Amino acid sequence: MTVRKNQASLTAEEKRRFVAALLELKRTGRYDAFVTTHNAFILGDTDNGERTGHRSPSFLPWHRRFLLEFERALQSVDASVALPYWDWSADRSTRSSLWAPDFLGGTGRSRDGQVMDGPFAASAGNWPINVRVDGRTFLRRALGAGVSELPTRAEVDSVLAMATYDMAPWNSGSDGFRNHLEGWRGVNLHNRVHVWVGGQMATGVSPNDPVFWLHHAYIDKLWAEWQRRHPSSPYLPGGGTPNVVDLNETMKPWNDTTPAALLDHTRHYTFDV
């Protein structure tokens, strides 16, 4: 069984293996396919039209399946690798070990945002940005520039306390747990972290930055925490809702799974705590 660990507790060898698996997926072109998929759904998901990966109830099950597919790709390179998660409510500093040269590298330089250290820096030659929104072919970050503070644990707890999963109009204007976690309403959790990291993370091609996977692994963990706190609160909508994915409706692009099939993460992996 795969165990997803807090990135702050990873050993040097676990970090090395995770980075090596990322670099191998990048080298073979498999990594960029995930970036392409994510960007296509960002562009296609709209408040008043069909929406699957974002701005909708299926934000959480869609990303759970997306991360599962990516984790399986990593494990096809190295079976020992699991997706770590980044608890940004606790690990809040630009000086965190997450941003060290032996792991993800740090923030970008002021001139153009280019990440200058670590295995994903352009100077290392192993991480060209091929699926992009502009002409820049290097990984960019601007930690803490777009918004100064990451969400706090108190803000996380305020969202976890919400007892209703989602509600009409089932988009970025909805009340409920999903939309507050996604960050369109209230204290702004998920979206704020993308903006805090900056660079490609603040765009539809956000998976270009490997921290995307650690961020979304934590979002997934928060969904699991919410489920434990509210065992009688179901995924909504249950059925008959236009433009969004109901409980037993198949999700694109896979068309072989439903939100109902993804409610129990323990069939696939557990978390360290």
From Swiss-Prot:
PANTHER family, A to Z: TYROSINASE FAMILY MEMBER, TYROSINASE-LIKE PROTEIN TYR-1-RELATED
One of the GO BP terms on file: melanin biosynthetic process
Name assigned to this protein: Tyrosinase
Catalytic activity: 2 L-dopa + O2 = 2 L-dopaquinone + 2 H2O; L-tyrosine + O2 = L-dopaquinone + H2O
Molecular function via GO: metal ion binding; tyrosinase activity
Highest rank taxon of the organism: Bacteria
InterPro entries in UniProt: Di-copper_centre_dom_sf, Tyrosinase/Hemocyanin, Tyrosinase_Cu-bd
The entry's keywords: Copper, Melanin biosynthesis, Metal-binding, Monooxygenase, Oxidoreductase
Record bears the keyword Metal-binding: yes
Protein residues bound to Cu cation B: 190, 194, 216
Cofactor binding, per record: Binds 2 copper ions per subunit.
Similarity comment text for this entry: Belongs to the tyrosinase family.
Protease keyword on record: no
Functional description taken from the UniProt entry: This is a copper-containing oxidase that functions in the formation of pigments such as melanins and other polyphenolic compounds.
Enzyme Commission numbers on file: 1.14.18.1
Ligand binding (Cu cation A): 38, 54, 63
Cofactor: Cu(2+)
Enzyme class at the top of the EC tree: oxidoreductase
